Amino acid sequence: MLGANDGLSSNFCLMMGVVGGGASATTILLTGVAGLVSGSCSMALGEWLSVTNSHELAVSQADRAMGTAAPEETLPGGSSAGDAASAAFFSFVLFALGALVPLLPFALLPAALRIVGTIAASIAALFVLGLATSLFNARSPLFSGLRQVMIGSAAAAFTYGIGQAFDALARWAR
């Protein structure tokens, strides 16, 4: 769930930043695709490294404790290369699914509805993810959903504003 939230939030903010900067539809779409691919790869790599490094640390600590090299399979709860690959795969997929939320409306809707559709889909998905987090945080679903929407929307508005400021500065410098 966290990977999906990362994908949704980062791609929503990224796309709103270039929308604020007055980018063309092609540039906005390319930015969304690049955000999806680069973010998914980054999440997968980070997850693989995290699981692999944790496993290597456990092996190293077991070696020191026993004063010898411990076979990996004797470690309690030890991770394997398969665990790292599986974690990386799921991080990649979850991030990509989240990143698709702002991207698909922009890609599929008529020009007049692209930005509104992207914002609406992203806000709806933020709310749903917030509802889902209420299963784990002992907060009410409404509170969790609205909090997620407020934070995600504020971040997207901030990047939109940065895009507008950059566009204004670029126009002034001409």
Indicate where each model-derived feature is located.
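Short helix-capping/hinge motifs at transmembrane helix termini and TM-loop junctions
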Residues: 21, 106-110, 137-138, 167
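Juxtamembrane boundary at the C-terminal end of a transmembrane helix
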Residues: 161-174
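Short amphipathic alpha-helical leader/targeting segments
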Residues: 59-60, 144, 166
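Selective transmembrane alpha-helices of multi-pass membrane proteins
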Residues: 122, 151-163
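Hydrophobic, small-residue-rich transmembrane alpha-helices and their short perimembrane loops
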Residues: 1-101, 112-125, 132-133, 155, ...
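Interfacial loop-to-transmembrane junctions
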Residues: 128-154
